[in-house]
UniProtKB/Swiss-Prot annotation:
The keyword Ribosomal protein does not apply. It is an enzyme of class 2 (transferase). GO terms for molecular function: alpha-1,2-mannosyltransferase activity. It comes from Candida albicans (strain SC5314 / ATCC MYA-2876). Residues 29-431 are lumenal. It is found in: Golgi apparatus membrane. Residues 1-9 are cytoplasmic. Its EC number is 2.4.1.-. One of its GO terms (biological process) is protein O-linked glycosylation. PANTHER family: ALPHA-1,2 MANNOSYLTRANSFERASE KTR1. Pathway: Protein modification; protein glycosylation. This is Glycolipid 2-alpha-mannosyltransferase 1. Residues 55-64 have a biased composition (Gly residues).
Amino acid sequence: MASTRSNARLIRFGIFALVLIGCGYILTRGSSFQPPNYQQTQSPAAHEKQTGNVAAGGGAGSGSAGAQVPLGKNRGPIPKAIMGAGEGGSDAPVPQQDIPDSYTLNDKIKATFVTLARNSDLYSLAESIRHVEDRFNKKFHYDWVFLNDEEFNDEFKETVGSLVSGNTKFGLIPKEHWSYPPWIDQEKAALVREQMREKKIIYGHSESYRHMCRFESGFFWRQEILNDYDYYWRVEPDIKLYCDIDYDIFKWMKDNNKDYAFTISLPEYKETIPTLWDTTKEFIEKNPQYLAQNNLMDWVSDDKGQTYNGCHFWSNFEIGSLAFWRSEAYRKYFEHLDKAGGFFYERWGDAPVHSIAAALFLPREKIHFFEDVGYYHVPFTNCPVDKEVRKARNCNCDPNKDFTWRGYSCTTKYYTLNNFKRQKGWEKYTA
């Protein structure tokens, strides 16, 4: 009898195991990591774009320049002024109004997203694109330019093309923009990389990182594929947008005469830029005419320009005017830095280079901090700390993770120097 009961239990256990195996097989099939069939799931705007029914300016329409793009009403209450200036501040408030029921292609300006990526970045980049489209670009259908030092493959082009609601364009970086200039001693550069590896300096050992920083500093804006645009928004893989942007952010930049905008700022690793400031001072001494009146020298230097405090705008999020990078002042500044060799003999990043240039060559009123966007790039978060702002912008971020008012952030200094009013409740997020 005991043997019969044991056999029965074994049979029941065997049946149960078969059921579990079957369920596991079904779940595995349902959660396959194979790429989705974008041809079947792409948006109508993307489909029309791929079939040639979208106007040259991008967006969903009948193909005429004045085609209308239907848009829904802004959701939730509207903050009166998210970026209002405090006493003495000169910054214009970001308008928080309903988008019209229709938004014509003629309302758009000459602007594009710009992404530097490799084919291997595809699916981490796809998440970034989804964030930007859902939070902003599905309303405005701006173009997206992708740059690579190698050819993009068909999978990359087809996948991003199905996600972007505007036109997608792909540019191959010229060899001379992604290689050593003739005056660089490559043996010396290799020795520096090895020394930085031993010191465990972040990206200090990387050759490709240096080419990337030099490219973003001096060549991305020279790409012929960008000649048709006046403004850009830099987007990288693995970023997140946490809040709705219900106004045309490019048009706002133009209408308010802004040339550079950021969401996060912090000090640079001093070990990567030991001579960057001295090299900058050499340039300024020879070219004082390029210093802007009412510049932000006091943001990048605590001693009236003697030394650099390391503060820089985090360049993985940039919205800016391409005219600034194309200007004589910036071109000559980059050429001076490039000849000095610090991109390879040290590890100069594009973020401090861009930031120093913007701080010195632009009036401070042309630089803007977007505190209503909600942005993440590992490991830092920008999240509006004012609860009413988060509700109005439909943000899904945790204000306790906001970096803006922390002691290590340079944005607090930016607010203080400009005498800007801070967000309601900021004091609770400083620790």
